[in-house]
């Protein structure tokens, strides 16, 4: 994921407040629990030296009623005088945390990257469609609708929608056929209007998923009008009706299933890309020291961290990645085993790039056994020196 919106944080002088908290409010008890958990964090942060004024500002924004539904989290990064980042997380953090330190803490944010799915749900009928922008990238509390509104709609403006049932008699035949043609034309023109809107949103929002539900005939007409970019990310979700889909528990469950399936497929694709590069000696490498060196040389196009098994220098690696415009992704441990919990896809490699073979990567048992704590050389450097000899 491109996290360039974090760059201004790294260009600001610290110290920093880094707060990650489960902000789900499904009932009064969860809202009360949020207030209690924040109260404990606020006391700790004040003891650590965080100014009371900024803590008061954070408390106000954190505890105010939120329109965001479902399970989610909140990430707040601030200096001692101003909030720099206030973001809704697409899932609660792995654990609540709050820090007052010289550098911002980023790993809890990175751990929920896989759940950040940019998707648009389209409930279509023969007159138009209702649009729901769900889990957009980097949603803000103040503008969680991202310009669409919670229930944005598109109406084609062609309202002759129903074919009449006309009794027998040849005198009615031409009228019936003519009306049917006008109705079909209205449906098609309405589909064109919806498709034009969706194509524009797909281009502007860089969506991951376009979810389509509603009237079966309207879906078919809409698909005939959509551009290639929209069709490439289209997924049909059965059981929906315009204006009613999200009120149905069964539909919400199906929507969650389709989204989870996409997340798993995307994780597997990233793991496959990394593994394929490793197996053919391509533009990838792994291991904390190797990745750090590649980041310093500006070689990394995408930093990859294992969720829950990040290396000790993960925060430093993340800052280096942001400083060199590298993307950052996180993978579940079940998808790939990254030595020391870190790997990278490279922009390029040369003779100075660390070896890409599995036997030479950090995390290899033989290599770790050969480590000499009294030596200033890394295992890789000693291996290369032995080869030269």
Place the predicted regions along the sequence by residue.
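Terminal alpha-helical anchor/extension segments at protein ends
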Residues: 1-389
């Amino acid at each position: 994921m491109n996290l360039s919106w974090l760059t201004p944080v790294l260009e600001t002088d610290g110290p920093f407040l880094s707060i990650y908290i489960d902000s789900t409010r499904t009932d009064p008890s969860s809202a009360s629990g949020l207030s209690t958990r924040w109260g404990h964090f606020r006391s700790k942060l004040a003891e650590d030296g965080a100014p009371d004024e900024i803590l008061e500002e954070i408390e106000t924004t954190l505890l105010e009623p939120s329109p965001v539904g479902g399970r989610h989290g909140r990430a707040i990064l601030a200096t001692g005088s101003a909030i720099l980042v206030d973001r809704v997380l697409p899932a609660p953090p792995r654990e609540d945390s709050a820090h007052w330190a010289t550098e911002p803490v980023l790993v809890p944010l990175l751990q929920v990257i896989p759940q950040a799915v940019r998707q648009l749900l389209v409930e279509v009928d023969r007159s138009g469609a209702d649009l729901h922008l769900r889990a957009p990238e980097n949603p803000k509390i103040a503008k969680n609708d991202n310009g669409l509104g919670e229930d944005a709609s598109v109406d084609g403006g062609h309202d002759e929608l129903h074919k009449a049932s006309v009794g027998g008699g040849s005198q009615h035949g031409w009228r019936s056929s003519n009306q049917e043609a006008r109705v079909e034309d209205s449906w098609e023109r309405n589909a064109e209007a919806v498709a034009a809107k969706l194509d524009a949103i797909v281009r502007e929002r860089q969506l991951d998923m376009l979810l389509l539900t509603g009237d079966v005939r309207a879906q078919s007409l809409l698909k005939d009008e959509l551009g290639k970019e929209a069709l490439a990310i289209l997924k049909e979700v059965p059981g929906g009706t315009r204006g009613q889909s999200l009120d149905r528990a069964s539909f919400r469950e199906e929507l969650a299933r389709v989204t989870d399936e996409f997340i798993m497929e995307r994780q597997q694709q990233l793991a496959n890309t990394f593994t394929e590069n490793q197996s053919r000696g391509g533009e990838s490498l792994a291991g904390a020291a190797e990745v750090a060196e590649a980041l310093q040389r500006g070689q990394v196009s995408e930093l990859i961290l294992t969720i829950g098994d990040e290396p000790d220098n993960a925060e430093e690696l993340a800052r280096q990645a942001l400083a060199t415009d590298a993307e950052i992704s996180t993978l579940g441990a079940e998808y790939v085993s990254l030595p020391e919990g870190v790997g990278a896809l490279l922009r390029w490699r040369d003779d100075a790039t660390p070896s890409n073979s599995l036997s030479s990567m950090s995390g290899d048992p033989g290599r770790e056994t050969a480590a000499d704590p009294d030596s200033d050389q890394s295992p890789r450097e000693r291996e290369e020196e032995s080869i030269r000899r």
